[in-house]
A protein has these predicted regions:
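Short Gly/Pro-enriched turn/cap motifs at secondary-structure boundaries
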Residues: 73-76, 106-108, 125, 161-166
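Short acidic, glycine/serine/threonine-rich loops at helix termini
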Residues: 8-13, 40-46, 76-81, 105-108, ...
Length: 201
């Protein structure tokens, strides 16, 4: 979207570049691929203030994105997730929990990492009907768009894999991390499918 610094070209144009980059280094390509997915999810479901604050830096390549779904207790059955989101007086949420197998979960290639995290907000129903979507930056972003203090997100470990070793697959710990709800409460799983459909199909 040119509004946020993009060129507005169709996917058919970028597909040629994607093919070359994937053939050269799939490990490196995954960093940008996850960012594209996070960008599209924020573009489709977040409010204008959030879009203006985060999307331009993601388009520039200064900030990257991730998709935080899987937990030690749940893989495909996301209705069992344990990560909690407690609303604060300022409208933000404190995110607490652990996510595993997070592609591009941590790196020093970009100035900030924008994690899209599914969690269960207070008083939400059990199962998939009680999942909400949150934007949790590695570093808090100030109102003027500059990077502030480190958020409560840390890397527990990096997985040792048989292939695609240049792509960091991480365990991420969220310890009262500041999160911002995207879209309506309890609609997070359907919103996250905007990103999942792009990344996994």
């Amino acid at each position: 979207d040119p509004k946020y610094g993009g060129q507005g070209m169709p996917k058919t144009v970028s597909a040629f570049f994607d093919e070359m980059l994937s053939a050269t280094s799939l490990s490196f390509k995954l960093y940008s691929e996850l960012t594209i997915g996070a960008y599209n999810c924020i573009l489709r479901h977040a409010d204008d203030e959030t879009k203006d604050k985060y999307l331009p830096k993601m388009v520039e390549g200064k900030w990257s994105g991730t998709m935080c779904l899987t937990e030690p207790v749940c893989g495909t059955d996301l209705g069992m997730l344990k990560t909690k989101a407690v609303e604060q007086s300022d409208g933000t949420h404190k995110i607490s929990g652990q996510k595993i197998f997070i592609t591009s979960g941590d790196q020093d290639l970009t100035e900030n990492i924008i994690h899209l995290v599914i969690a269960r907000a207070s008083d939400s129903p059990p199962g998939t009907k009680g999942i909400s979507l949150f934007l949790v930056p590695k570093f808090i972003v100030k109102d003027d768009g500059s990077i502030g203090t480190r958020n409560g997100v840390s890397t527990g470990s990096v997985e040792h894999k048989m292939g695609i070793k240049g792509s960091a697959t991480c365990v991420l710990n969220f310890d009262d991390a500041v999160g911002y709800m995207i879209g309506p409460k309890n609609k997070g799983l359907s919103q996250m499918f905007t990103m999942m459909n792009l990344e996994r199909i």
